[in-house]
Amino acid sequence: MIARRRFRHRLEYGAVRGLGALLVALPHRCALAVACGVAAVVYALASGRRREAARRVRLVFGESLRPVDVSRICWTSFRNTAFNAVEMIRIRKLSLAQMEEMIPELPAAVASLRELMARTGGRGLVVALPHMGNWDLAGSGCHLSGLPIFSVAGRQRNPMMNDLLNRLRSGHGMDILERGGGALRQILERIRAGQVFAILPDTRSPTPDLLVPFLGGAANLARGMASFAYAAEVPVVPIVMRRRGWRHFTLTLHEPIWPDKTAPKAVELERITKTVATIVDAAIHETPEQWFWYNRRWVLDPVV
């Protein structure tokens, strides 16, 4: 069993590296075209994942969407995920000028974040980036712009793929902490030292936490994002990224959510988490095809 698993891991790693080498060698738009074709084949074959994504979309939007609209949302979300992978595989080839051409609002966003950091007395920020646009690319763009940004990621089952993903995510030097161990302490220390912590706020916590209204249901969201902001006395800044066409993006910075240290901690953690969830909910309803509907942990599933 162990030998079979190792063989499968090597096969997966080899296939990804081989395809990755091709995508790096091609011009950017050609690489996206290849990814679009591969995504179309996989999408046609992955009927179970496709049906589950459609079920989720219908659960959120009910009868307000036609079947053709549901299909469009599911396909665009899937295709954009393939595009995200291409951009991360090619991340080392992207200069700051190219990043700013792809994300025109990047310089203004970084400037706004720096202004906020100047108001925290030498501390950093917590940035809430939902699964929209290319959230990894947004973090890399901020780091390439000189912003001391870092994030945390879970460990993949395939150790070779885990190392590869971390190398890609840190392609321009962005620090990635591995979830678990002493990561929680490190996150708080880094924020207090003036770094920016980027976190995905729209994933279901695997253990009971805060039940928050989200997408027409109740989502069990982790209070960690709000806890770090409260403990470090820094704001949470929700940022929504959207793909425009094949290779361009928009960035929308929402008003910072400052913790109120005079209020009870539990009340503040719930308020901050709910405020971010409301912003993300509105963004998903506005452009549902931009959100990632294929997460294995569906955000509205109850915690068992």
Please give the residue ranges for each predicted region:
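Short, flexible loop segments at the rims of nucleotide/cofactor-binding pockets, characterized by
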Residues: 97-105, 154, 173-179, 215-216, ...
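Catalytic core of membrane glycerolipid acyltransferases/transacylases, capturing the structured
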Residues: 122-181, 204-210
